[in-house]
């Protein structure tokens, strides 16, 4: 039950975040995020790539019975760690709090996925 709730929250968050990065449908948030990416020395293409990784992870984490689940969780963990690094390097630690939360939740899902995969092979 807990895993389903965490996956639902992560998936909803990253589906929203990736849709904005990929399509720019929410103009104000898109422009704010693009300005942050540019302040980190990254361009629109990098932002689009992050959006693709987030979309893959948000969908992949639902497939916990296969290797796709842990791979999706690892993708979300990687983007969260990258966001934490950028916020700690260029902003304040407070700006990185959402990424710290998503990193912890992604690590939980990844841990659960790996333990279910290991039980198949042992």
List each model region and its residues:
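Membrane-interface extramembranous regions
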Residues: 1-122
